[in-house]
Structures are given as structure tokens and as C-alpha cells.
Amino acid sequence: MLTYSHQNIDQSDIDTLTKALKDEILTGGKKVNEFEEALCEYMGVKHACVLNSATSALHLAYTALGVQEKIVLTTPLTFAATANAALMAGAKVEFIDIKNDGNIDEKKLEARLLKESENIGAISVVDFAGNSVEMDEISNLTKKYNIPLIDDASHALGALYKSEKVGKKADLSIFSFHPVKPITTFEGGAVVSDNEELIDKIKLLRSHGIVKKRLWDSDMVELGYNYRLSDVACALGINQLKKLDHNLEKREEIANFYDKEFEKNPYFSTIKIKDYKKSSRHLYPILLFPEFYCQKEELFESLLHAGIGVQVHYKPTYEFSFYKKLLGEIKLQNADNFYKAELSIPCHQEMNLKDAKFVKDTLFSILEKVKKGYCG
């Protein structure tokens, strides 16, 4: 099966893990700091805190910003953790509709803030598929209204916005090291920031809220969590980070092939990356034309049967039964239509152009046989 994304584990990673497993300290050691320093150097930021997942990173980011009893404005087109973690931190969640690239609509965000901005605890944006949001416009809004900004850049490690690494402009930025991302620590995540006070707070909460006073004594000053990332995982992360730019180049090669081959086809559109951005290509979404919406399940199953592991990103968060019970029925037209249209096809560093051609040929062959027809 040619999956929509795939980890890159080579002999250097295996050797790194073997060495780390033989160390005296498997967790809470120097590899944690080394990984954080490597991330800071790569990102061009001052501070980083690595954690056991991006969900944990989001939870502590919201908590550090003090969103309890306030509203977090976010996108519905994301993995549920973006909103879930805000609820875990005691916030209320409100969804803002998206644009046709899958990113939050900054104009609709501005319209919401014009209505009322007093009780907004944070704005949390997602760089969908690795393609940056319009960060200048969004950052200007958050500064105008004095609202903290979280960039859930879980898709976007290594992506660029106006020649800068994605993750530099927000108060707190989140990254994921899940195996489907360009680098992995098995599970894992990070928060990065130039704000030392916020990162110190997150590091405290990461390990039970405990500080050491003396060699044999400690004090718990906050109610914290066990969100630590092990030294073994961090050792892998350090080695993976060395390969990140190469992995991104390979993903870009596959994406560029698709862009050219899919141009002006009669079945679907693709997302165009603006010339002042560079996507990490975490995903390669195709957006089916409306006459194929109701055939998407048939298309999905046919592609799986042909050995192409597609996926859908994402069901809008407000469509989950939990959120329907919490918030009632919500309809955001662009997010709803994006969900009907979207399929993510294989695009990752383990592929070659022969694989990409197989995906293209198979996709077109199946679509030619699918009967067009609008729903209803």
C-alpha cells in the first residue's frame, strides 16, 4: 500500500536509537535539552519545549496563556486536538470558516473580532497541509485587539512564509513529530516561542509542576502533568532533524509533478501555493468538483483496492457528536464543502516519480469510470 504519508527511518536512525537505549539515562537527561536547542537553531527562535505529543503541547500552550473561561477562536478544519486542548484548558471554542486553501479566513476572523473581542482568550490557527496561513494579516489583528496567537503548525515544520520559517511570528507555535509528519519521534510534539516566560511555564507544567530546590528536595508549585518526551525519542528527533530539508525537497518534487500533471483536469482542483510561501507538503489535497462529491466513498474504496492509501482531511470538528452536543448544529459553508471535496493522495519522501505517476494514472483511470452526478 502506497500510504498518503510515511515515516523515514534509515540505518542512521536505528544506530542512534541503539546508542540511546544503551545510555544510563533514558528519560529526563541531556538529549531533551539538545533536541530543544536543535529545534531553536533550525527554526530561528529563542526557546523550545518538547513534549510527548502535539496535543500535550497545545494543552499547555492554552493553559500558559490563561484561556480558562474565555473563548478560543479557531478553525474547524483540523485534527480535533486543536479544539479539544482548548476545552481541556477550560476555554470555550468558537469556529471561524475557512478559505478554499483550507486555512482560516482572516477576513471572517476580523469580522468576528469587530463584533466582540473582550472575552477572546486566544486565536489558534492551523497551517493546513503545511501551507502557511496569511500570518501578517492575522498577526496584525491579534496585536490590534491584544489577543494571544497560537500557530498550530503541526503540519508545517520547515515551511516558509515570506522567507521565514513558519512558527516564528506567533506567541506560541506548535509542532508535531507523529510518524506521518516529515520527521518523527514516534509520538511527540513541541512548543516554540521567543517568550521565555511562557516556555518556562510550559516546561514547569510538563513535569508535574515540580521544581527542584536541593539535590534531595523538591516542591510542587503548580498542578502539572507528565507530558515529558524521553531521551530516546529526543535522540531520534535530533537525527531526524538533520534529514528534514532533504525530506522536504523530496516531498516538493512529488508535489511539483502532481501540480503539472493535474493542471486543468476535469475532475478536481488542487491548492496553489502562493509564491511568497513554501509548503512542507505534509499533505497533497485534491478537491473534487461538486459532481463527484457523492461518489467520493466509491472513489476512496477503489483507490484503496488499487493500493493507493488516500485519506480525508478533515471532517469539520463541529460535525463530531461530542461537539454537536456541546455547541449544537453548526454550518460553515466553506468548511462543509471542503470536507465533501477533499482527498489526500500519497506525497512523501519515500516515494519516487514512478510512484507518483502510478498514483496519477490510477486516479485518472478510476475517475473516468465514476459516474458523474450531483447529490440528491
Curated annotation (Swiss-Prot):
Keywords: Aminotransferase, Pyridoxal phosphate, Transferase. InterPro entries: DegT/StrS_aminotransferase (IPR000653), PseC (IPR020026), PyrdxlP-dep_Trfase (IPR015424), PyrdxlP-dep_Trfase_major (IPR015421), PyrdxlP-dep_Trfase_small (IPR015422). One of its GO terms (molecular function) is pyridoxal phosphate binding. Gene3D superfamilies: Aspartate Aminotransferase, domain 1 (3.90.1150.10), Type I PLP-dependent aspartate aminotransferase-like (Major domain) (3.40.640.10). One of its GO terms (biological process) is polysaccharide biosynthetic process. Belongs to the DegT/DnrJ/EryC1 family. This is UDP-4-amino-4,6-dideoxy-N-acetyl-beta-L-altrosamine transaminase. It comes from Campylobacter jejuni subsp. jejuni serotype O:2 (strain ATCC 700819 / NCTC 11168). The gene is pseC.
